Amino acid sequence: MYGIAWMLPALILKCHGQTLIWPGYECVLQGLLALLIAQIEILANPLFIAASCLLLTPNKKIGAAFAITALIVATQTFTLFKVDIYLDEGGVNIAHLNSFGPGFYLWYSAIVLVAVAACVRLWRKSRSI
């Protein structure tokens, strides 16, 4: 799910009446620059990868913490509806988020799935003690 999300349209933007469609990989590249304007949702990716790896180890608490943190950070993506997205350095071309594409929903679902799996594993472990 996560890998496929990188190839599918993730963000659908409007700029001067034109529709721009950013696939997931472009969102990742642009997300690195978004850190400069306090848009931290790009950090959900390394947190997600760390959580996925930690769920395969006995560190269930740390894996759950990473997964929940990834989910919280990824949720900041919804604030993009209220943020100007600058497409050039001069501020001439400013886009606004129109809607999310299937890539976004797959990306977000993968993070939700890992967070739920981490919490279920942690809950099962606590009940077996």
Predicted features and spans:
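Compact integral membrane and secretory-pathway proteins
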Residues: M1-I129
